[in-house]
Structures are given as structure tokens and as C-alpha cells.
């Protein structure tokens, strides 16, 4: 085993592991951080969506009921995945990726994919709509873990180790850009580079790749008025505080109003139709307003604990595949959280990305359930 994510862990063959890991306990620190984020998320989604539900659905409890349903579904998914033998995950990695790519193609078909906000990203499932890009992220991590673990002797070579994975990465990215979904494309690119490095690729190769990504990314932004407006609003939101910069300005006002202790739960003003997407992409700003700096620190601590325990699982895993899988899923989960928080505090352009386990949303919650369930399964079989 030569991957950086697992270089300290000894190898144990798959046949020595049971089909279902019933005798091992999950990582309770990992589980506790997840439950803490879920609990805070339920409270804040209810608070943020109360008036929105009353105005949009004539039912103040409409959105929180749906969120509770999403959490229950994600919890069931996480429970069953936490009992799965990682060897089975390795077997289904490639078929699962093909299934995810099929859904990305399906969403582009008129009449099947739904258009919202100028993007065709959703498939209607009756009571709610499903966003395939949210599922694609963890499935691509699963694929990378399987593929990289089988090519350890070639990872120092660009042509035979790095390039094949980059070519494969372009398939979901091109489908996502057709929706368009620039945020999910950026996340998959970021996670791929991180996992290539963890899998043993040369830093010089990845650094050159990072530089090579800049020109096409800049071209995509420059030739898309919508994305260009987001970037200009990010650079100077106060130039157009009632237009393109409105959302970011309102986010700043939320944090400024909250101070250290916050205005108090339920006492925030931004949820009264001032801050767009306050229950989804900008829920961190509402936490800052009502719970203050202390509430924001609590969120960061929970994600910090999740990151430390997830990476601990990666370094203590018994083989290369599970080590890379734990590393990739942890990096994906925490990376998305940092991107969301970075947008809310004005460090990054707006991307339309939810805060995992906290924001409202069925697709993101199911994706989080998938990630958490697999991490718990990996923690069961990691060395203590």
C-alpha cells in the first residue's frame, strides 16, 4: 500500500473481514458531531422557513415537515450503510458510478429534467424533486477509491496513473456543465485532485493541473453573464447593494447584527424575506445573526470533530481502498461545508451550495446520509 492516506496502516485481505460488521462499535465522536449538526439544522430550518412556508404554501410548518421526512430517510439510509461490509462497497463502485452518470444524462432530457432558476438539475419524484449532482459527488469518490487503490504502482506516472482519472473526471463534469452546475463541477475537481494526491500522485503533476484548470474556468465565467455577475458581486457587493450584491450584503448585515451572542433564537430579521435562500445556502448567516459568534463556532467545532474523526478513520483503515474512501468522503463533506461558509462570509463567490446536515434540502440530506453511513461503516472496521 503506497497511498499517502493509508501509508501507516497494515494490509488485511478482504476475506478476513465479516460480511456484516455487527460486532464493532461505530465512532461515537463522529456520530455525535453528525447528530449535533442535525439538531442545530432542524432548529434553524424551522426558524428560517416558518414565514416562508406560511407565505408560499399557506402552511408555516410545510418546509420543516418535509425536512423532517428527509432526515428520517437519510437516517435509515445511513443506518443500513453503516452495517455494510466495505468489501461490498468496493464491488459496487463501478456500477454505482454508471448509475450516477445515467441519472446525469436523464436530467438533461426535456420532460424529465426540471428547470429551476435557469438550470436543468432536478428530476421530479412526486412529492419532491431529486438533484442527481448531489448523488454524483459521493459516488465519484467511491469510484476514485476503488480505481486508485488498484493502480498504486502507477500513480507516480502522469500518463498511466493520473491522466486516466482526469479523463474519467471530465465525463461527469461535462454533464454537470450542461445543466449547468458549476459548483458541483468545482467540488468534483477539488476532490479528485485531493484524492489523487492522497493516492500517491506527484505534487508537481497536480500543481500543474491546478494551474491548467484556471484558464478554462475563467473562460466559463467570462462567457456566462450570470456567473460573471456573481464574481463581480463577490468582489464588490456594495457597488450594487440592491441588485447583484443584495444577497451578500444581507448576509453581512446578519453577521453584524448577531455579534458575539446573537439576537436570540427566533429574533432575527433576515428571515423576514430579506436574505434570499436563508433556509438553504445562507443558513450559516442566520445562525450568525440569531446565535452569534458562539453559534458559528459551535458549527465549526462540529465540522472540525467530524473532519478529525473521518481522517482518523482513513489513517487507521486496514487496506488502501477503505483508507482512500474515508479520506475522500471526509474531504468532500468538510470541503463543501467550508465552501458554503466561505460564501456566507464573503470569502468566495456564491455557488448555490448547501451546508451539509444543516441546510434545508432532500437531495443534499440523502447525499449526507450516504456519506455518514459509509464513514460509520469504515469506522467499525478501522484499527482502534
Regions found by a protein language model. Name each.
Residues 19-34:
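N-terminal membrane topogenic signal
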Residues 30-47, 53-247, 285-343, 370-374:
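Hydrophobic alpha-helical transmembrane segments of multi-pass inner membrane proteins, especially
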Residues 123, 155, 162, 260-261, ...:
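Short clusters of hydrophobic/aromatic residues that line enzyme substrate/ligand-binding pockets
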Residues 259-294, 317, 321:
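Long extracytoplasmic/lumenal interhelical loops at the membrane interface
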Amino acid at each position: 500500500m503506497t497511498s499517502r492516506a493509508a501509508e501507516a496502516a497494515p494490509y488485511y485481505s478482504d476475506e478476513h473481514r465479516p460480511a456484516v460488521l455487527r460486532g464493532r462499535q461505530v465512532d461515537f465522536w463522529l456520530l455525535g458531531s453528525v447528530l449535533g449538526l442535525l439538531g442545530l439544522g432542524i432548529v434553524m430550518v424551522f426558524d428560517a422557513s416558518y414565514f416562508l412556508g406560511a407565505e408560499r404554501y399557506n402552511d408555516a410548518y410545510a418546509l420543516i415537515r418535509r425536512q423532517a421526512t428527509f432526515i428520517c430517510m437519510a437516517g435509515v439510509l445511513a443506518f443500513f450503510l453503516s452495517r455494510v461490509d466495505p468489501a461490498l462497497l468496493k464491488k459496487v463502485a463501478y456500477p454505482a458510478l454508471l448509475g450516477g452518470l445515467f441519472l446525469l444524462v436523464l436530467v438533461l432530457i426535456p420532460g424529465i429534467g426540471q428547470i429551476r432558476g435557469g438550470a436543468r438539475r432536478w428530476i421530479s419524484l412526486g412529492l419532491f424533486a431529486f438533484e442527481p449532482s448531489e448523488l454524483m459527488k459521493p459516488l465519484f469518490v467511491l469510484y476514485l477509491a476503488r480505481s486508485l487503490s488498484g493502480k498504486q504502482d502507477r500513480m507516480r506516472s502522469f500518463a498511466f496513473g493520473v491522466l486516466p482519472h482526469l479523463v474519467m473526471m471530465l465525463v461527469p463534469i461535462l454533464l454537470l456543465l450542461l445543466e449547468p452546475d458549476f459548483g458541483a463541477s468545482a467540488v468534483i475537481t477539488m476532490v479528485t485532485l485531493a484524492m489523487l494526491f492522497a493516492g500517491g500522485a506527484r505534487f508537481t503533476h497536480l500543481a500543474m493541473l491546478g494551474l491548467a484548470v484556471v484558464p478554462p474556468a475563467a473562460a466559463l465565467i467570462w462567457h456566462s453573464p450570470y456567473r460573471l455577475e456573481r464574481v463581480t458581486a463577490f468582489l464588490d457587493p456594495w457597488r450594487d447593494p440592491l441588485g447583484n450584491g443584495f444577497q451578500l450584503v444581507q448576509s453581512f448585515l446578519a453577521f453584524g447584527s448577531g455579534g458575539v451572542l446573537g439576537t436570540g433564537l427566533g429574533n432575527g430579521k433576515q428571515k423576514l424575506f430579506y436574505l434570499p435562500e436563508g433556509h438553504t445556502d445562507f443558513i450559516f448567516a442566520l445562525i450568525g445573526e440569531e446565535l452569534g459568534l458562539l453559534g458559528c463556532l459551535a458549527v465549526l467545532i462540529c465540522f472540525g470533530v467530524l473532519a478529525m474523526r473521518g481522517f482518523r478513520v482513513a489513517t487507521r483503515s486496514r487496506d488502501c481502498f477503505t483508507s482512500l474512501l474515508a479520506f475522500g468522503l471526509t474531504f468532500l463533506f468538510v470541503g463543501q461545508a467550508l465552501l458554503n461558509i466561505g460564501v456566507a462570509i464573503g470569502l468566495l463567490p456564491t455557488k448555490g451550495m448547501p451546508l451539509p446536515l444543516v441546510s434545508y434540502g432532500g437531495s443534499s440530506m440523502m447525499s449526507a446520509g450516504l456519506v455518514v453511513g459509509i464513514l460509520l461503516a469504515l469506522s467499525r472496521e478501522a484499527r482502534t
